[in-house]
Amino acid sequence: LLGEDMDAETIGRSILSFTNCHPYYTQQLAYQTWNNWKQNGYSDTLVETAITELTHVHDMDYERLWSTFNKTDKKVLIGLTMQMGTPSSLPFLQAVGIDSPSTAFSSLKRLGQQGYVIRNEGYELDDPFFRRWIEVKREGR
């Protein structure tokens, strides 16, 4: 149905890996991937292109959201995005410029209550597109 070169299982796994199986974000990414395939045909970068497009679509939303965070929250979000380790660890704190574990924990608690950070095996951003947006902004792309 999707084409000889298309490996639906690989595409599905790529989508689920990026979204961490979150239903809402999985649906968004699957829909955008499908639309891109329908418009442009299959390519090896089908999922990555959809991720880039969805991140770009929400750029202004993420800019506005980012401006609402205090400096500590921004540092924690950057540290989580860049996978700098456990937020209470010395390497994490030094890398992001936070002086104490209690400050980082207060930020994590606040970000968790607001729904931006979740705890699974460790702390992570709930929205994978927001995570990608932070990565892109940090790299200056």
What do the PLM-derived regions correspond to, one by one?
Residues 12, 27-30, 35-58:
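Conserved C-terminal helix/linker of AAA+ ATPases
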Residues 1-2, 18, 33-36, 83, ...:
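Alpha-helix C-capping/helix-to-loop hinge sites
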Residues 4, 18, 40, 47, ...:
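Alpha-helix initiation/capping motif
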Residues 8, 18-31:
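The conserved phosphate-sensing helix
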Residues 6-8, 25, 39, 43, ...:
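Short, surface-exposed helix-loop/turn micro-motifs enriched in polar/charged residues
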Residues 14, 18, 32, 50, ...:
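Short acidic/histidine-centered micro-motifs embedded in hydrophobic/aromatic stretches
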Residues 10, 52-141:
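C-terminal leucine-rich, beta-strand-based interaction scaffolds used for sensing/assembly
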Residues 1-19, 38-41:
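Helix-loop-helix "sensor" segment of P-loop NTPases
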